[in-house]
């Protein structure tokens, strides 16, 4: 049995296959998932699992070079914005929600959570751990 923190086999496989600058999206329950992008749907019910729990678990195994969020989060979900700003610092890049949706078309996968708060979406750009 796997000993590390991340137990979901689909997410673990995607993270293991990411190369430098590959994109992984962690999304709320409402973000559209483009055709052709792998969907990992872990939503169970409203709020479960949460965006934060999912993100924090993924970060136990993924080195992040940059993280992209929608500028709309600043006003519509400020607590989450402040949390992400503290977590990522200068690695956090603010873009429009439309640009975030366009970028998600290039993601290796989108993890759909049960998050029910607006604009709780992030694109993680894989870094290099050496």
Curated annotation (Swiss-Prot):
Gene3D superfamilies: RbsD-like domain. It catalyses: beta-D-ribopyranose = beta-D-ribofuranose. GO terms for biological process: D-ribose catabolic process. Substrate binds at residues 28, 97, 119-121. It holds the Pfam family RbsD_FucU. It is found in: Cytoplasm. It is an enzyme of class 5 (isomerase). The active site is at 20 (proton donor). One of its GO terms (cellular component) is cytosol. One of its GO terms (molecular function) is intramolecular lyase activity. InterPro entries: D-ribose_pyranase, RbsD-like_sf, RbsD_FucU. Keywords: Carbohydrate metabolism, Cytoplasm, Isomerase. Its EC number is 5.4.99.62. Pathway: Carbohydrate metabolism; D-ribose degradation; D-ribose 5-phosphate from beta-D-ribopyranose: step 1/2. PANTHER family: D-RIBOSE PYRANASE (PTHR37831:SF1). Belongs to the RbsD / FucU family. RbsD subfamily. Catalyzes the interconversion of beta-pyran and beta-furan forms of D-ribose. Homodecamer. This is D-ribose pyranase.
């Amino acid at each position: 049995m796997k000993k590390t923190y991340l137990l979901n086999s689909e997410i673990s496989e995607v993270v293991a296959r990411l190369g430098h600058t590959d994109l992984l999206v962690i999304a709320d329950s409402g973000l559209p998932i483009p055709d052709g992008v792998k969907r990992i749907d872990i939503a169970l019910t409203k709020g479960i699992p949460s965006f934060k729990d999912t993100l924090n678990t993924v970060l136990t195994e993924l080195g992040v070079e940059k993280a992209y969020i929608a500028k709309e989060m600043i006003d519509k979900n400020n607590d989450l914005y402040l949390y992400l700003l503290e977590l990522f610092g200068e690695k956090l890049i603010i873009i429009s929600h439309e640009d975030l949706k366009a970028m998600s078309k290039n993601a290796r996968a989108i993890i759909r959570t049960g998050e029910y708060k607006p604009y709780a979406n992030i694109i993680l750009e894989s870094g290099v751990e050496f």
